[in-house]
């Protein structure tokens, strides 16, 4: 399986990498949050742009991205607009969503974009090609905050992302029971052992699914999300606790 290298970070080997999400509503908050995050122990900075109020002003969005890049130049920057239908803060049209991601790519400030699988097949394929032409990696994602589908469906979605040339397929699902967590872990393992030719990221959310955020190295998930301050999804734990557990499991 090939790895993915962003800056000096190699994703897909060793302990799972820690991603943290920064959720700021304006330029002032971006500045203050960035300074606070700079001291934290993590590997990838995700900017959750759906929390940003001034989305219609592309210049403001790019100015905020520039602050993040300058404050943490060594950290890979993942640009993510999470749609309302997949648990995000704002609803925008598909056209606006694609345009926003293209503007981020054009800026030269971001290393990776998050692209939702169910945006539309043609738009997804075109945006992946556009990102790759500008040396930007694509995390292709799917989120369900209500349920966990069968393992076969989880694997089918991850394989579809892979067929669309995502650099890193990602899926996050809500368990309704402990057995749902096992379904997610079993699907992750089967994907990793039988189909994946690149790193994948999977997680089961909420308190029930916490084990999935810790056991990625065992089952085949290459990264996990931790919280510096406010969690961006149910079940996230602090980056310090997360690093401790990931290191223990890696060294065992």
Curated annotation (Swiss-Prot):
Q: Might you give the EC number(s) for this enzyme?
A: 4.2.1.10
Q: Tell me the CDD domains matching this sequence.
A: DHQase_I
Asked if the Swiss-Prot or TrEMBL record annotates the protein with the keyword Transmembrane, the reply is: no
Catalytic residues at: 143 (proton donor/acceptor), 170 (schiff-base intermediate with substrate)
Task: Give UniProt keywords alphabetically.
Answer: Amino-acid biosynthesis, Aromatic amino acid biosynthesis, Lyase, Schiff base
Q: Which InterPro entries match?
A: 3-dehydroquinate_DH_AS (IPR018508), Aldolase_TIM (IPR013785), DHquinase_I (IPR001381), Type-I_3-dehydroquinase (IPR050146)
**Catalysed reaction, written as an equation:** 3-dehydroquinate = 3-dehydroshikimate + H2O
Does the record's keyword annotation contain Nucleotide-binding? no
Instruction: Enumerate the residues binding 3-dehydroquinate.
Output: 21, 46-48, 82, 213, 232, 236
> Pathway listed for it?
Metabolic intermediate biosynthesis; chorismate biosynthesis; chorismate from D-erythrose 4-phosphate and phosphoenolpyruvate: step 3/7
GO BP terms: 3,4-dihydroxybenzoate biosynthetic process; amino acid biosynthetic process; aromatic amino acid family biosynthetic process; chorismate biosynthetic process
Q: What class of enzyme is it?
A: lyase
- Single GO MF descriptor: 3-dehydroquinate dehydratase activity
Q: Provide the transmembrane region boundaries.
A: none
- Which family does the record assign? Belongs to the type-I 3-dehydroquinase family.
Please describe what this protein does.
Involved in the third step of the chorismate pathway, which leads to the biosynthesis of aromatic amino acids. Catalyzes the cis-dehydration of 3-dehydroquinate (DHQ) and introduces the first double bond of the aromatic ring to yield 3-dehydroshikimate.
Which PANTHER family does UniProt cross-reference here? 3-DEHYDROQUINATE DEHYDRATASE (PTHR43699:SF1)
Q: Fill in the subunit field for this protein.
A: Homodimer.
Output the HAMAP family linked to this UniProt entry. Answer: AroD
NCBIfam families from the entry?
A: aroD (TIGR01093)
- Protein name, please? 3-dehydroquinate dehydratase
Which species is listed as the source? Escherichia coli O1:K1 / APEC
What gene is it encoded by? aroD
């Amino acid at each position: 399986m090939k790895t993915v290298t962003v800056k000096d970070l190699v994703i897909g080997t060793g302990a799972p990498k820690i991603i943290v999400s920064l959720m700021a509503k304006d330029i002032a908050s971006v500045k203050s949050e960035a300074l606070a995050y700079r001291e934290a122990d993590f590997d990838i900075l995700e900017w959750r742009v759906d929390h940003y109020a001034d989305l219609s002003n592309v210049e403001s969005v790019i100015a905020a991205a520039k602050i993040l890049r300058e404050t943490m130049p060594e950290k890979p920057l993942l640009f993510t607009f999470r749609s309302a239908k997949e648990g995000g803060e704002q609803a925008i049209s598909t056209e606006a969503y694609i345009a926003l991601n293209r503007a981020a790519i054009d800026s030269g400030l971001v290393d990776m974009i998050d692209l939702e699988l169910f945006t539309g097949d043609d738009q997804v394929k075109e945006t992946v090609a556009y990102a790759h032409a500008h040396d930007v990696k694509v995390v292709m994602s799917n989120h369900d905050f209500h349920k966990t589908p069968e393992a076969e469906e989880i694997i089918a979605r991850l394989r579809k992302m892979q067929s669309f040339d995502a650099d890193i397929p990602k899926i996050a699902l809500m368990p309704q029971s402990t057995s749902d967590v096992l379904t997610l872990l079993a699907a992750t393992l089967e994907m990793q052992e039988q189909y994946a030719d690149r790193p994948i990221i999977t997680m089961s959310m909420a308190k029930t699914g916490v084990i999935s955020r810790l056991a990625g190295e065992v089952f085949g998930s290459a990264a996990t999300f931790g919280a510096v301050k406010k969690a961006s999804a149910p079940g996230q734990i602090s980056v310090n606790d997360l690093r401790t557990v990931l290191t223990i499991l890696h060294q065992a």
